[in-house]
Amino acid sequence: QGEAAAQSFLALGTTVDELTEGTIPNALLYRHISSDNITPSSGTQNDLWNRLQNYYARSIEVLNVANELPDNNTKATNLSKAYGGYIGNLHAGYALQLLAECFSTTPAAEGGSIRLNNALVSHESLFTMAQNHFNKALEFVQMQAIKDASGFNYNAAVRQINTYKLRLAMHQQRYSDAATLVALAINDSEQVEVIYNNDGSDNPLYAAIGPNARDVQVTANLEAARSTTAEQNALPLKHASVDKKNPNRYNIYASALSRKGALVIADAADIHFIKAELIVRGVLSGDALVEVNKVITKYNASDAETAMPSLERIATLRRIYLALRGERTADIRRGLEQGSAATKWQQRKTKWLPLPEQELENLP
């Protein structure tokens, strides 16, 4: 999941104003995306495509293994079946969501499809499939075998699944559904994350846009957009030299990332900004100003907002506080961002990555 999510966040961030190509890149994917010059024959998108397809395939394998376990009604088997159904469906749903958000047969416009299991599947259908997988994950995690398992935080797992459902609802502009889900998502002490301090591997975001960033870097535009101490604390950035003879050649990197730190999919900041947006949209009761300040004051109390936030202001805040998670692209696609970034987006030829050339051959 971590590699698939990280590579998706990087590609999506490069389609908007979060990321751009590195100063002296080895790989050309981010140059092709940021220059709006990527085609099916480019080939640079193939690794991400394969990564996401593999992520989905491995998730389905987990489901198949769970389904093949004997129906002997033992405690161990019941737990394995339930846990496999929960994990397999959760990740299958997220893999489909990432595929739909990253790739399309119509890169310049909505309404595209991707190739899945040798069939063309529309984005709309992929999102429906993802939603169904999340719902099935919820069914499995509510089985008695999991509730009875020692050491397993059943309630946290339920909140985790509902957070995935919530984010999908927001991306699809199903705001009434999101208003129901937001109370069921993670709390202030939780986050949906991929942990890297156990198996020896490194956080892939750190590897890509940490101090050794080469192929991709944070945009100067995003660096300059951090106008308060709170924003600079929330998104600390530094410059790393790439040419000892020329100090003006550097990459801008995310200095808060650590080699063994967690890769965050969603956290409390997501939830509070979603609540604020839903309140402003009139589908949730509450105080939008309180919600945004719960995020801001965590980083610097004196930077608390004093005016009731508009949707435009929420988009600006989300750009900083939820940076590098793929949310910026989703916000522009769903029309939350209405500024110059949205205008530039409309002018792009590549709003989704094109499918690799071989996937377009002999289409069904």
Question: For each predicted feature, which ranges?
Answer:
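Aromatic-residue-lined binding/catalytic grooves and analogous aromatic/hydrophobic interfacial grooves
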Residues: Q131-A137, V141, R159-V194
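Short acidic-aromatic linear motifs embedded in glycine-rich loops, typified by GG[WY][YF]DAGD(H)
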Residues: Q1-Y94, L98, C102, T106-S125, ...
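Internal helical hairpin/lid segments
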Residues: K260-R281, V290
